[in-house]
Amino acid sequence: MAPEDTYPELQEEEIDVEAELEKLILEDSEAEAGTSSGETAAEPSPDPGEALKQLQHELEVVRQQLKEKEDAYLRLYADFENYRRRTQREKEEFSQKERQKFVLEILPVVDSFERAQQQLKLETDRERELHNSYQSVYRLLVECLKKMGVSRMKSVGQPFDPNLHEAIARQPSPDYPEDVVAVEYQPGYKLGDLVIRHAMVAVSAGSPSSEPSPPAQATIEAGPENTPASPQNPQPS
C-alpha cells in the first residue's frame, strides 16, 4: 500500500485547509480593492472658484496669443501693401520714362513736317499733291501722340516761365509787353503734366522806344507891334 493511501483523512483535511486559505486570500484582496475605491471616492472635489480662476487665466493666455497673431498679421499686411504700392509706382515710372523716350524721338519728325509746311508754297499741282501726301502722315503722327497723352504748349502771348520756356533771345516787341513770349522758334510739349521739351522762345523787352522829340522853341506872344505884315494888308511905307 502506498504511503499516501495510509492516511486518507489527513489528505482530505489538507485539501480543505488549502481551499480555506485561498478563500481568505480572495476575500482579503476584495477588501483591499474596496478600501481603495472608498478612499478614491472620499477624495474632496475641487473648489469651483479655483476652477473658474484657472479657466479665466487660460482664456487670458489665449486672448494674448490671439492679439499677438493679429498684430503680426497687420504688420505683414502693411508690409505687403507698401511693397505693392512701391512696385506699382516703379512700374508707372518705368512706363512713363519709356513713353517719354519714345516721344522725344518722334518730336523732331513732327518739327520737320511743320517746317516743310511753312516753306512749301503750293504753286503747282505737284507741290499740292506732295503737300496732301505728307499731311496725312503728319496728322497720323499727331493723333498718335495725342493718344499717348502728349499735348503742345501755347507759348506766344504767355508770360515767360523758365519751367516751360527756354529763352534764346530778348527783343523789343510792339505787340507784347515786357517779359511776355513774343516769338516761338520751337514748340514745347507735355506728356500728361510733365514737361518733356521746353519751348524755345524770344521774350519781349517791351515796346521799342520812340525817337526823342526836339525841344520846344520859345515863342513870343504876338502883340500889335510884333504882328507880321499880312500879304493881303501890306504895311504902309
Curated annotation (Swiss-Prot):
It comes from Synechococcus sp. (strain JA-2-3B'a(2-13)). Its main location: cytoplasm. Participates actively in the response to hyperosmotic and heat shock by preventing the aggregation of stress-denatured proteins, in association with DnaK and GrpE. It is the nucleotide exchange factor for DnaK and may function as a thermosensor. Unfolded proteins bind initially to DnaJ; upon interaction with the DnaJ-bound protein, DnaK hydrolyzes its bound ATP, resulting in the formation of a stable complex. GrpE releases ADP from DnaK; ATP binding to DnaK triggers the release of the substrate protein, thus completing the reaction cycle. GO terms for molecular function: adenyl-nucleotide exchange factor activity; protein homodimerization activity; protein-folding chaperone binding; unfolded protein binding. Keywords: Chaperone, Cytoplasm, Stress response. The keyword Ion transport does not apply. The gene is grpE. Pfam families: GrpE. Belongs to the GrpE family. Homodimer. This is Protein GrpE. The keyword Signal does not apply.
